[in-house]
Amino acid sequence: LHEAFFAAFFGALFYVRNVSVPALAGMDPAFTLWKDFTAAWPSAGPKGPSFTPMGAWGIPALNTAILLTSGATLTWAHWGLLKNNRSQLNLGLLLTIILGVTFLGFQAYEYHHAYTEMGLTLGAGVYGATFFMLTGFHGFHVTLGAVMLMVVYGRCLKGHFSAERHFAFEGVAWYWHFVDVVWLGLFILVYWL
């Protein structure tokens, strides 16, 4: 069910970005709504404020590297659990938590920069609303994941998991990897296209 939802979600986002907007711009006369309409993406609309769109390099690329690294540190922690290597498990989880919180810090900085220096706000038309909704919703899920990782880390410190019994650890790990994969899709669709 979740896979179908996210396939539909990203498919719809891809459709809007790559099919609807060009069609409205008159690339296909059958879909043209207004003869003189020219689409521009990103756009604030005809009466929206001017803004600078967010680029893919800089903080977004750094955040992508941070999340991918956090997936690797979490996998390394999992290997430590399976080998009953508690120091590897705990260090890997701690690094993953630090990387997740760092991602959130950079995202907060990116939002502040967008609002104060780029003019990119929630009121900046469809682009601004879409940008903040998609990245903010993902940031919320990263926050939930970081909290769950902290709970699992506390349980690991108390010795609650073994190589044979660690369902909660695996559930949180799957969630975290899912958040990583969703970010890759967002990075491509929101920042590159």
Where are these regions (language model features)?
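...captures the hydrophobic TM-helix bundle architecture rather than a specific catalytic motif
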Residues: 1-193
